[in-house]
């Protein structure tokens, strides 16, 4: 039985399945430019209590981040329709930035090593302007889903198992925003009660919820499946700059060293689409209530245990894995 069939039957968790797909698609904890990518799953970062029975709590998993609001999508479509490259080298696209890149990864994880040093390396030895640093989960969501035309980023796996990355335990001087706010720990939504462990517990519980389980196949179609490229990507408002697609870049055919280096730099800095794993619509997961064994259900105690495992951090043998194998 394939891993996909096991997931459809409810024998493995959504987290486990996403990690499996990322690995098959060439994503690795050891490569910041092709780091594992996970979806934004929630849209409610204001409520005091998180209601996982309300569909409005969740992000629309059938649409990429650039299409979460009609107004912003229209701006991307306008660029796509009106695109005109006299040289003919760059075909029309909707999104000129990517949902996963080295800079996105280290920006999310800047408060924990070794990502702090990697962030400083990419930034020329200093932290970014405080107003551009990751400092609030809600603000990051609004930027990626609504407010910023240059931001369509998704998440990294650590959002679902590692409370440490939300805490400035090392007391880094991250700067002061124009509003006067000094950056420290990441500002959490009210339902997290100011507790990074509680945020991770509820976020992981949301990932394994009935709603996400019933719609995760749609996000898989966008990132790893048939809606990743071609006409299906156009129809799903999921078309990125052509250099983000591995099949569109043939380094052997680029004779000019400057052009080759520029292309390599573009991919390293702005990210790359994962390898395509599925050519047909991904099957839907069956109802958890009827298929998921008790030991795979997410309870408060189990989720807290996940958070406890994540806190241990990296080991010498696996510097970037944070004990994911135990989850």
Which residues fall in each region the model found?
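Charge-patterned, phosphorylation-rich low-complexity C-terminal interaction regions
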Residues: 291-327
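Long, non-catalytic protein-protein interaction scaffolds
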Residues: 1-303
